[in-house]
Amino acid sequence: MRGHSALMMAVVTLAAVSSGAAEVANTAAVSSDYLIGTILTFAESDRLLRVNDVDDVPVYHYPPEKGKRTTFFEDRMKKKLANPEKIRRLYWKWYSMGYSAREVVQHLDQTDNRELKEIYHNLGVGYAEFVAKMNV
């Protein structure tokens, strides 16, 4: 009877060890499958700095196959503000709404974009001159 118990204990121990090793090997195989094909990717911006760009060619941020290509906001602002009639209408709208030159400058000075900051500064200075002319 003692021999039978010892033999049963040995069989149970071997069965537990062999099934545990199979589970560990199986888990390792599955986890290594997940590691294959993982590649780190980085998002790249298509917009480039145009420091030395002297051309007035508009820069498009949509690919040509989209049909309608749109220029950057800064380029559209410069084009619209090149028309004195549109600027005058904008100043009249602000003046009729009761905005002071100080309020306009404060609201326009909320950007970190260097190109827009220059455009907005010129708008604020122009509106201050417009208000000064209207108050005389």
Curated annotation (Swiss-Prot):
InterPro entries on file: RXLR
Record bears the keyword Signal: yes
Location(s), subcellular: Secreted; Host nucleus; Host cytoplasm
Alphabetically ordered keywords of this record: Host cytoplasm, Host nucleus, Secreted, Signal, Virulence
Superkingdom field: Eukaryota
A GO-annotated cellular component: extracellular region
Short motif (RxLR): ranges: 47-50
Signal sequence annotation: 1-22
Keyword Transmembrane helix attributed: no
Stored Pfam families: RXLR
Notes on the domains: Has the canonical translocation RxLR motif, but lacks the canonical EER motif, which characterizes most oomycete effectors identified so far.
Family: Belongs to the RxLR effector family.
Function recorded in the entry: Effector that completely suppresses the host cell death induced by cell death-inducing proteins.
Protein name: Secreted RxLR effector protein 15
Source organism: Plasmopara viticola (Downy mildew of grapevine)
